[in-house]
Each structure stands twice: as C-alpha cells, then as structure tokens.
Design a protein with these regions (language model features):
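Beta-rich carbohydrate-recognition modules and glycan-binding surfaces
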Residues: 14-181
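Sec-dependent N-terminal signal peptides
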Residues: 3-13
C-alpha cells in the first residue's frame, strides 16, 4: 500500500520541485506586495495596487518633478533561492510606460540589482518566458555590462517590477502569475 501511494504522489512531488509559482489575486500571494514610489527621494510619482479575483493591478503616473521618475511594485523581503531554475514565465498585460522585472540581493538601495525590460502589450494578456541569466546588473538605474550569474540566484531577497522609462506618463500593469521553471 505504501509503495502504491508513493508511486501516485511521485509525479506531483516532482512537479513541485520543477516549478515555483507566485500566483496573484484575492487570497493569494498579492497581499505580500507593496508599492514604493520615488517619494522616498522627494519625487511626486504615484502608484497603487489592487487585488482582483485572479490578478494584481498596479497603476499610476510617473512624474519627473523634484527629481522623480519611478514607481515600483515589490514583494516583501524574503529568501528566494531560485538557483534550481533556468527560466521565469510571466503572464501580464500592460499599457503606457513600460516596466521591468527586478531582483534584489540586498536591502540597501544603493547595492546593484538585476532587471530585464518587459514588452508592452497594448492591454492584451501576454505570457513570456525569459532566461534568468539574461537579467542585467544595474546600479541606481544605470546598466552595468554584467549578466545575472547562476550562483547569484541563491541570494535573491526581493522580486519586483519598476517603471522602466524615466519619462512622464501613465502606466497600468496587471499580473496573473510569475512561474520559475
């Protein structure tokens, strides 16, 4: 009987080890995410989040006044050892200013992070798959010619999204899920 149960559960257990998914929406993972705007530096950009039944909606307006220029949606700090994965799949839709996926390895704002730009979707749902090692290193918004290293995937402590164009305008970004595989 025990052998039979193990055989039945084995495919499920393997699937759990081969994928890690952050699913958004009411009563799901969206409540662990918060908005951080450029107001932390004196800027006047605005952003807000709203949980829907199956997604998280992040929208706002980027302002360049007072040296502003960004709005971000971030998961609370946690350990994300994603070193067993090669790809990230994201289902989202967006309009307005484009956004980027970000990974942080430090709580300090001035320590370089990693990001990759996401294509706009004209408000149509899109599912993309990106190679994790294609994320690039950035230092305070400036690209450093270095890709994310496989060993750094053990050090990720925050996942997020940030407006990716330093220009005035509205944006809307709705995300269904992030899946590491």
């Amino acid at each position: 009987m025990k052998t039979y149960l193990i055989i039945l559960l084995f495919p499920f257990l393997m699937q759990q080890q081969n994928n890690y998914q952050i699913d958004f929406g009411e009563e799901k993972k969206g409540r662990y995410w918060s908005v951080v705007n450029d107001g932390v530096m004196g800027g006047l950009s605005r952003g807000s989040k709203k949980l829907t039944k199956n997604s998280l909606l992040f929208k706002g307006e980027v302002s360049l006044e007072n040296n502003g220029g960004f709005s971000s949606l971030r998961r609370s700090f946690s350990e994300f050892d994603i070193s067993n994965f090669e790809y990230v799949e994201i289902k989202y839709r967006s309009s307005g200013i484009s956004l980027a996926l970000t990974f942080a390895v430090s709580r300090r704002w001035y320590v370089p992070n990693y990001k990759v730009s996401l294509d706009g979707t004209s408000s149509k749902w899109k599912t993309i798959t990106l190679k994790l090692t294609d994320l690039r290193k950035y230092y305070i918004g400036k690209a450093i010619n270095e890709k994310l290293k496989k060993e750094t995937l053990k050090e990720i402590i925050r996942i997020g999204f940030i407006t990716d164009e330093k220009k005035y305008g509205d944006f809307e970004f709705e995300i269904d899920y992030i899946k590491f595989k």
